[in-house]
Amino acid sequence: MKTYAEMTAELEQLAAHNDRLTAGLRSARAQIVELKSDLERVGDPPNSYATYLRRCEGTTIDVLHHGRRLRVATAASLDLDSLTPGAELRLNESLAAVEAVPPSDAGNVVPVVEALADSRLLVAVAPDDTRVLRRAGSLTTEQLHPGDHVLVDLKSQLVLERIDRAEITDLVLEQVPDVAFDQIGGLGEQIEAIRDAVELPFLQQDLYRTYGLRPPQGVLLYGPPGCGKTMIAKAVAHELVLRSAEVRGVSVAEALENSAFLNVKGPELLNKYVGETERSIRLVFERAREKAAADHPVVIFFDEMEALFRTRGTGLSSDVETTIVPQLLAEIDGVEGLDNVIVIGASNREDMIDPAILRPGRLDVKIRVRRPNLRAGREILGLYLDDAVPVREDREELLDLAAREIYDESPASAFVRVEYSDGGSDTLHFRDFVSGATLRNIVDRAKKLAVKDQLATGEVGVAAQHLRDAITTEFVENEDMPSAAHPEDWARVSGLPGGGRRRVDAVVPLQGRTLTTPDIAGTAAAGEDGATA
């Protein structure tokens, strides 16, 4: 017979075994419940999604579901007041809207053709497929223009959002540049001519009408590279805004916001697809008309104009200019009724531009931007070596020294010998190839040398030797630049004297120069005549 202790131990073992069985049953029950829930979820009918269109009577709404327009009921938890057209909804098996979900961020990107009066949009889905779509709620108040790209859902026939395409927006800079005429040195005559051609007609419109004068439709700035053509165009836009603010009695900030400087980058506008470049030109002028219609000044600036509007029939691989040039002509002629639009073109190969563009009534005013002579060069140097730059010697004497070194006519400064087809030849010096960009680069080089010198020795300021070294380096780096392979083209782009009147047969680079100009203290002031190549 078992003792009391043995029976107690056996009971404890049975109790522990019972606890383990209970825990196992509980675990099995939980797994069974989970499996049952999974089985029920697998067996549930699938939910679907629809696009919200509009609210109807009561709690019903119209949605677009798989291409069909349905009127469905809504769950009590769905906030109908927060729904806007284009919102994405989840529908249950009974096709009742139960939840709003994040909208789709994918679809087709298409250009806007026209914004209709009733807030609908005409878009070009394909070259031969134009459709009318409705705006989603997020676009109800946004102003869209022809040429803007939008994301659309063709199934729901909705425009979802506006898309900014970098390759298109980069072609046109609409912000008016902050460049004033007093920041441009050595181009006083050209600045006066363009102000008479552009600012006067805009500011004195009534007086022009009294005399029966028509403002010029365009201005061509031509000349060698780096001589300030682009800066003049930017300054024109800036000055027009300032004068417009004075005449209209509005703030400069308001005038800047409403005016536009459409800077068209010629080479980037070219597109291999037929008609795309022409479409881009149309969009540029549409933006101009839109701004000008509100009586605000608009400048359309075509840089590197010969890249786009070359003389028709001169193309080697393709004649894209046969359609691009007529498109520009049609747009310029169409701008004749707008007093606030001016077209400015810049080119260093004006001989390649189609003559139809240059005739009176289109680009009426032609202004040649010449290379700076000695006086102009010194003025430009003074803009960059101004009072804010620390110097070791007298600033005016430093400017005189730099101008004399750059415009030296001694044999040591000979750059190239140009041989003409008539047997003649000219020896040209570095001064004949100086541009505003060259002068700025020389001053920047001198400043860098001064910085390095200050770090090494502690001496502060630009010295005469820094300028000499900068001039020498600038000229040495350009010794190999003349093109002997295509002398005629190089001569035209460089703006050589006599270019266009005599054929250039050869360009022969000469030896570099050695600066031997005496120090500041021992040198008298030089003359002020300079090359105007």
From Swiss-Prot:
GO molecular function ontology, one term from the record: ATP binding
One of the GO biological process terms: proteasomal protein catabolic process
Listed Gene3D superfamilies: 1.10.8.60, 1.20.5.170, Nucleic acid-binding proteins, P-loop containing nucleotide triphosphate hydrolases
Coiled coil segments of this chain: 1-42
Residues that, per the record, bind ATP: 226-231
An annotated GO cellular component: proteasome complex
Keyword annotations of the record: ATP-binding, Coiled coil, Nucleotide-binding
InterPro entries, per the entry: AAA+_ATPase (IPR003593), AAA_ATPase_domain (IPR050168), ATPase_AAA_core (IPR003959), ATPase_AAA_CS (IPR003960), NA-bd_OB-fold (IPR012340), P-loop_NTPase (IPR027417), Prot_ATP_ID_OB_2nd (IPR032501), Prot_ATP_ID_OB_N (IPR041626)
PROSITE patterns for this protein: AAA
HAMAP family per record: ARC_ATPase
PANTHER family linked to this entry: AAA-FAMILY ATPASE, PROTEASOME-ASSOCIATED ATPASE
Record's protein name: AAA ATPase forming ring-shaped complexes
Organism whose genome encodes this protein: Brachybacterium faecium (strain ATCC 43885 / DSM 4810 / JCM 11609 / LMG 19847 / NBRC 14762 / NCIMB 9860 / 6-10)
Taxonomy of the source species: Bacteria, Bacillati, Actinomycetota, Actinomycetes, Micrococcales
